[in-house]
Amino acid sequence: MLMKRHLNTCYRLVWNHITGAFVVASELARARGKRGGVAVALSLAAVTSLPVLAADIVVHPGETVNGGTLVNHDNQFVSGTADGVTVSTGLELGPDSDENTGGQWINAGGTGRNTTVTANGRQIVQAGGTASDTVIRDGGGQSLNGLAVNTTLDNRGEQWVHGGGKAAGTIINQDGYQTIKHGGLATGTIVNTGAEGGPESENVSSGQMVGGTAESTTINKNGRQVIWSSGMARDTLIYAGGDQTVHGEAHNTRLEGGNQYVHNGGTATETLINRDGWQVIKEGGTAAHTTINQKGKLQVNAGGKASDVTQNTGGALVTSSAATVTGTNRLGAFSVVAGKADNVVLENGGRLDVLSGHTATNTRVDDGGTLDVRNGGAATTVSMGNGGVLLADSGAAVSGTRSDGTAFRIGGGQADALMLEKGSSFTLNAGDTATDTTVNGGLFTARGGSLAGTTTLNNGATLTLSGKTVNNDTLTIHEGDALLQGGALTGNGRVEKSGSGTLTVSNTTLIQKTVNLNEGTLTLNDSTVTTDVIAQRGTALKLTGSTVLNGAIDPTNVTLTSGATWNIPDNATVQSVVDDLSHAGQIHFTSTRTGKFVPATLKVKNLNGQNGTISLRVRPDMAQNN
């Protein structure tokens, strides 16, 4: 239909149910907030109360329309300028569906300014059209083949950038969603949503999805950018709490506390990892020219590859001998290739896992670094610094120097001169021997085997027994608190407790020649202990839970809680002498002798009875002899 155009006039096509045809109705364009007159045809339609189907509004080149609302499948075709329009129709059939009708159409040469797109609303920006300062919220959407500048996506607001389309300066707020399709471009996007469920949570309904190109994106806390296999992102800045998932290409990413995950088939180049940033290269993923700065972390999983890495002082490398990593660190060139690691530096959260059949040479383990050598793996020329962590068992082969310069070795079922710092762990397998082991806050697990020389537990140390372990030498505890738990420790050795703090023996069967309590406190909890406790005054011995002590005590302060038992035998090496006895359990005098009766005695300086019992147990034949 040919329509005449007058100055400052636009036209509506209205379906007339009486005539069965469209009626052309004119409406003066709005200016300065004043509404123009509405054609009589519109008024007649309202008066008849007949249903009115979709109407089309045409804004011609050179014309400007201010305000107005589009509803009920209305269309506004903008070849001029539309300012301040509210769009609430066009998406009734679902996001970005070709079956939708209605909405605002920005044609080539047309401009839409300050548009608000609400629930079920759709703004379509055609090639050559421009939309600026658009707010899309509550499930509304914007479809781009043209240009959109400074769009804001709120509360399920969506933006679809098609091939040839460009979005500049989009802000994606909570539950907003931007999709960049193949051939589309988004620049300067700010992403504030998509990662609320945590790192790499299964969340594909918000954030930025890149199948085309994204440039100069900023990802803030809770923000997420997902790069599809067809997508590419350049110059991305990721802050703490934000992350980037890469199935395609990511170039020149800067991690300022944020995370980057490179998946199978994905590629990341020129990534800069600053403090608290974290780049993860998964199996099949590839990274090149990554730089790790102080407190940054690069993690390369088994099957992942990172080349030309620059690891600066204080940067962390986390990998295994099943990955491929090459680069430089403060020692020079390093590599992890084909199951062989060389010249690796581990610090500040760095870690190297040496798998069975693989090797590592010249590994430096400093504060916060961890070297984990699995059963069947080998690490030679290891240099342990203060705060370095070693994880190994007696089935591995490890040799090097401790932080104090002493040489240590694990191999052939024998461990010599190990020093386990806080976080370190060593497992002694059945039939193997550990000699002169020092545990400084680490964990020593014995699954049988033997302790030889002097085994030292310092503050924070734990010795866990599984099965029966033999100690024929000395187990000594120095300053601080330590724990001996589980299993059984047998043999003709002795336990020496010195320094302040508490040694707790829990759920353990302890059979030793003697226990020397020189300083501090010895707590026996739910354990069976067969030995004499030779103590110094001022120390304390506590029997708790269901503990049974078979042996004499001389002299110390003793506490028996309800359920604990102290059996005083007549063959003890010393008489039992107690300074302060707090007694709520059971004390029994027992005899293992035959022949003439030999009395046993208990001397107590101060007794605090708490419904405990003291009883004699003698053999009837002994009673008859006396």
Identify what each model region corresponds to.
Residues 57-74:
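Short N-terminal segments immediately surrounding and downstream of signal-peptide cleavage
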Residues 2-4, 56-59:
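Short, intrinsically disordered N-terminal pre-domain segments
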Residues 472-482, 490-514, 526-626:
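Extracellular beta-strand/loop-rich repeat segments of large surface/secreted proteins
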Residues 70, 86-99, 116-118, 137, ...:
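Beta-strand-rich solenoid/repeat architectures in extracellular/passenger domains
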